[in-house]
Curated annotation (Swiss-Prot):
<dbReference type="Pfam" id="PF07714">
    <property type="entry name" value="PK_Tyr_Ser-Thr"/>
</dbReference>
<dbReference type="GO" id="GO:0004674">
    <property type="term" value="F:protein serine/threonine kinase activity"/>
</dbReference>
<dbReference type="GO" id="GO:0106310">
    <property type="term" value="F:protein serine kinase activity"/>
</dbReference>
<dbReference type="InterPro" id="IPR008271">
    <property type="entry name" value="Ser/Thr_kinase_AS"/>
</dbReference>
<feature type="region of interest" description="Disordered">
    <location>
        <begin position="585"/>
        <end position="617"/>
    </location>
</feature>
<keyword id="KW-1003">Cell membrane</keyword>
<feature type="glycosylation site" description="N-linked (GlcNAc...) asparagine">
    <location>
        <position position="22"/>
    </location>
</feature>
<feature type="topological domain" description="Cytoplasmic">
    <location>
        <begin position="234"/>
        <end position="617"/>
    </location>
</feature>
<dbReference type="InterPro" id="IPR001245">
    <property type="entry name" value="Ser-Thr/Tyr_kinase_cat_dom"/>
</dbReference>
<keyword id="KW-0325">Glycoprotein</keyword>
<feature type="glycosylation site" description="N-linked (GlcNAc...) asparagine">
    <location>
        <position position="165"/>
    </location>
</feature>
<dbReference type="InterPro" id="IPR043891">
    <property type="entry name" value="SPARK"/>
</dbReference>
<keyword id="KW-0067">ATP-binding</keyword>
<dbReference type="GO" id="GO:0005524">
    <property type="term" value="F:ATP binding"/>
</dbReference>
<feature type="topological domain" description="Extracellular">
    <location>
        <begin position="21"/>
        <end position="212"/>
    </location>
</feature>
<dbReference type="InterPro" id="IPR011009">
    <property type="entry name" value="Kinase-like_dom_sf"/>
</dbReference>
<feature type="binding site">
    <location>
        <position position="311"/>
    </location>
    <ligand>
        <name>ATP</name>
    </ligand>
</feature>
Length: 617
């Protein structure tokens, strides 16, 4: 009898263990079926899966009160996701293509797993504001903008490190709001579009319906043609009558925007020129907080007392308003804790000031990184703050490259475009030079724009722009942050020297830590400082193929292992010889390895990152 009892106990333990190992996934993947599927390319599909998983988390949270599936179900959840993708992309491997790791699907922000844990971190006033602003249909622009703006108040309380890129701290507010602040739930059309950038798919048509569509289309085309002809005759007559009347140049008429509205997907607020004049005290010089080649930046206050920044562009013409409108619309749709939020815009023609083009952004309290490194501020930044700024810059740029749709290449990353909030969280700003990367292209030729010392060699020489052009600029800014030396300085002989060449000369001689500013407060461990220097040198390598991607940079900076990607030998200083650059532009792999006093090993990534057998320098 005792023997049988022992067998029963062993059998129970074994079956329980097996059940835990093969726990079914609690996420309901059928929820994603009504939503439009992506085009068959890696970047778009990965973004769809990322946002789709977040919508599933929200649906799961609404049903169970838990944000994430249990860790023991991670494998089955990935298998279920793979099965759902196989229906429209049969050869697409979710984890290997998108870089997802198995545990990430059950890991989130600051170990938060339940609704009560999340709400305990956020002030009741912020939760109440979100419940009020988000509890409506979010299909149109105004309620969506109001809802997402209220969610930004959650971010200061969700600043912990994220273990993966599936459900990070930046995404938790949207997951929570869709589940509980909005009574319609995450699967509602407006909620999914506003908070997860997912559109419902159009219903499929049968053969008979297609015929009806063709007939209807022809009828609409015929009617439209008649209307166009009628409108043309009306326009000609109206234009002729206007020539016989004196021009009306009143201020009210002049301040009308050339663009009356934006598209349905934008969350921008359109300000009148008079509103902005009032907010900036008629563009008073005392309100100027920044100057640049594209115009001045003014501080001001909105009617509700909110402090904002107004960037006023120079030398504008109404003819460029369409491109301007498209650019700000795309920028406004990109939301991340390390990107400066765009609140609104203004386009107007006035009788005295001429054509105006202005964007309205959040005002940050600690100025720019340039102010703290090279401005009048005397206090040195301590290492913990510099480390936070470096990580924030990297995460913001990585999101522009791989989280935004379409991906955005900034083109003008520099210290003055890295703004710092009250917690010294970095905000990547100034998208005036942003260039949108067309799907399927590895590079594009464009008019070179940027700032001396920060522009990548292949871009400066040939105008060929890729995400790795931004990586180069990031490396230069990171070196400035570590050394407190400007991008371009003069040596003892009065010759210009780039900070990248100066840093490389020290690293090559085994003096890596000499790059770090003397007397830095709260200086970190030598091995950590050395890792950051080597990452900066790698990013600012003159050869394109040698640089990592921003995703790889984030992983290296966040890693507790003191490893770094292999660094190839650099060619001649500042800008490599044209033959080397030519080869670099058309190449996607390189080799080389850097030894260091603390004994770094090569940190290799799959994909397009540099790796392989190396030559020690």
């Amino acid at each position: 009898m005792l023997f049988l009892r022992r067998i029963a106990v062993v059998f129970f333990v074994f079956t329980s263990f097996s059940a835990a190992q093969n726990s079914t996934c609690p996420l309901d993947f059928s929820v994603l079926e009504p939503f439009r599927r992506p085009k068959p390319d890696g970047a778009t599909t990965c973004q769809y899966l990322l946002q789709g998983l977040r919508l599933l988390y929200s649906h799961h949270l609404r049903q169970t009160g838990s944000f994430l599936p249990p860790p023991e179900s991670a494998a089955s959840c990935w298998a279920a996701l793979q099965s759902s993708v196989a229906g429209f992309l049969p050869r697409f491997d979710v984890r290997s293509t998108c870089g997802f790791q198995t545990p990430w699907i059950s890991q989130g922000c600051m170990d938060i797993t339940t609704r009560s844990q999340f709400e305990s971190l956020i002030p009741n006033s912020s939760l109440a504001t979100t419940a009020m602003r988000c509890n409506t249909s979010l299909e149109s622009n105004t309620p969506c903008a109001s809802c997402t703006q209220s969610l930004s108040a959650f971010q200061p309380y969700l600043s912990g490190p994220s273990l993966g890129n599936v459900s990070d701290c930046a995404s938790f507010p949207s997951i929570y709001a869709a589940a509980f602040a909005n009574s319609l739930g995450p699967t509602d059309k407006g909620t999914a579009k506003c908070l997860f950038q997912l559109d419902l798919a159009s219903p499929t048509s049968s053969g008979a319906n297609k015929v009806k569509v063709l007939v209807s289309s022809f009828s609409v085309l015929l009617v439209a043609s008649v209307l166009v002809i009628t409108a043309w005759f009306w326009y000609c007559r109206r234009k002729k009558s206007k020539l016989l009347k004196p021009r009306d140049t009143s201020l009210e008429a002049g301040t009308q925007s050339r663009l009356d509205s934006m598209s349905e997907s934008t969350t921008l607020v359109k300000f009148s020129f008079d509103e902005i004049k009032k907010a900036t005290n008629n563009f008073s010089r005392h309100n100027i907080i920044g100057r640049g080649g594209y115009g001045n930046v003014f501080k001001g206050a909105l009617p509700d007392g909110t402090q904002v920044a107004f960037k006023r562009f120079k030398n504008c013409s109404a003819g460029g308003d369409a491109n301007f409108a498209h650019e700000v619309e795309v920028i406004a749709s990109i939301r991340h804790v390390n990107l400066l939020a765009l609140r609104g815009y203004c386009t107007a023609t006035t009788p005295y000031e001429g054509h105006q083009r202005i964007i309205v952004c959040d005002l940050v309290s600690n100025g720019s990184l340039h102010d703290h490194l090279f401005g009048d501020l005397e206090a040195q930044l301590a290492w913990p703050l510099r480390q936070r700024i470096a990580l924030g810059m990297a995460r913001g740029l990585a999101y522009l490259h791989y989280g935004a749709q379409p991906s955005i290449i900034h083109r003008d990353i520099k210290a003055s475009n890295i703004l710092l909030d009250e917690r010294f969280e970095a905000k990547v700003a100034d998208f005036g030079l942003a260039k949108f990367n067309p799907e399927g292209m590895t590079h594009m030729s464009t008019r070179v724009a940027g700032t001396m010392g920060y522009v990548a060699p292949e871009y400066a020489l040939y105008g060929q722009l890729t995400e790795k052009s931004d990586v180069y600029s990031f490396g230069v800014v990171l070196l400035e942050l570590l050394s407190r030396r400007k991008a371009i300085v003069t040596d003892e002989e009065g010759q210009p020297v780039s900070v990248a060449d100066w840093a490389w000369s020290l690293v090559r001689e085994g003096q890596t830590l000499d790059v770090v500013e003397d007397g830095m407060p709260e200086k970190g461990p030598p091995e950590v400082l050395e890792k950051y220097v080597l990452i900066a040198v790698l990013c600012s390598h003159p050869q394109l193929h040698a640089r990592p991607t921003m995703d790889q940079v984030v992983k290296m900076l966040e890693s507790n292992e003191f490893t770094v990607i292999a660094i190839p030998q650099r060619p001649i200083p500042l800008v490599a010889c044209r033959e080397e650059i030519d080869r670099s532009v058309s190449s996607s792999s390189g080799s080389g390895k850097l030894t260091s006093p603390t004994g770094y090993q090569a940190f290799s990534f799959g994909g397009d990152g540099p790796s392989g057998n190396t030559n020690t320098t």
